[in-house]
């Protein structure tokens, strides 16, 4: 047998527990129609304005954080393109040097074929060969557009780090500096004079200004990378032609050596 009386409703406890839950956010449809309705409506509108201003500030801060990260990635990619250009230019110079050495070898082979020619060439002064290139760090200059974009972004990097030490949590760092008022204690003053709302508006405007500048940097980086890639494509085309020509000359020289 149950220990409860017959008239006991087991769901009464649930009702009491539900009453202890925090009240949901007021909606305009939940506002009373009594004499306090105008005051409640004003308070609701102020809360709604603050809530939306806070959400907008957080959203623009997140967008700003993503923009900073994108710019850093763009600069890193541009620097890798510059390094790649240096490798291509160095490779092209090495191929040119190999072609010169191969031409000199072909002249020696042709002179060896004739004993008389060999004696004459023996007493002739040897041609002056260019000094070998010193192997060192490869220094290459990118196109002017990309170089300017990289320098501009790097100049701004210190400013970004000083303003936002942790870019991945930029939105938290930004909003923590904004004084917040509890939603239940909104001032009865007209909200344009509200310091919290004014701070949110200033933060939103500042974020939008920085977003505009940052997007301009991203555009310059993208255009500079496009020009750099096109120029490196030209280097690759030249290098491919020279390598093909060098391969043919090597096979021809090898054939002449076997005929000696």
Swiss-Prot record:
Please give the residue positions where the record annotates the modification Phosphoserine: 65, 77-78, 114, 163, 184, 206, 212
Its main subcellular localisation, reduced to a broad class, is cytoplasm
Topology versus the membrane: Peripheral membrane protein
Which terms under GO biological process does the entry name?
autophagosome maturation; autophagosome membrane docking; cilium assembly; protein transport
Q: What is this protein called?
A: Synaptosomal-associated protein 29
GO CC annotations on file: autophagosome; autophagosome membrane; centrosome; ciliary pocket membrane; cytoplasmic vesicle; cytosol; Golgi membrane; SNARE complex
What parts of the sequence cross the membrane? none
Task: Describe the subunit structure.
Answer: Forms a SNARE complex, composed of VAMP8, SNAP29 and STX17, involved in fusion of autophagosome with lysosome. Interacts with multiple syntaxins including STX6. Interacts with EIPR1. Interacts with STX17; this interaction is increased in the absence of TMEM39A.
Coiled coil, from the record: 76-107
| Localization of this protein | Cytoplasm; Golgi apparatus membrane; Cytoplasmic vesicle, Autophagosome membrane; Cell projection, Cilium membrane
Q: What does this protein do?
A: SNAREs, soluble N-ethylmaleimide-sensitive factor-attachment protein receptors, are essential proteins for fusion of cellular membranes. SNAREs localized on opposing membranes assemble to form a trans-SNARE complex, an extended, parallel four alpha-helical bundle that drives membrane fusion. SNAP29 is a SNARE involved in autophagy through the direct control of autophagosome membrane fusion with the lysososome membrane. Also plays a role in ciliogenesis by regulating membrane fusions.
| Domain t-SNARE coiled-coil homology: from-to ranges | 198-260
The record, for SMART domains, names: t_SNARE
Region feature Disordered, mapped onto this chain? 1-42
PROSITE patterns xref list: T_SNARE (PS50192)
The entry's family comment says:
Belongs to the SNAP-25 family.
Q: Which UniProt keywords apply?
A: Autophagy, Cell membrane, Cell projection, Cilium, Cilium biogenesis/degradation, Coiled coil, Cytoplasm, Cytoplasmic vesicle, Golgi apparatus, Membrane, Phosphoprotein, Protein transport, Transport
Record-annotated disulphide pairs: none
Biased composition, class Basic and acidic residues, residue ranges: 20-32
GO molecular function terms listed in the Swiss-Prot or TrEMBL record: syntaxin binding
**InterPro entries named in the record:** T_SNARE_dom
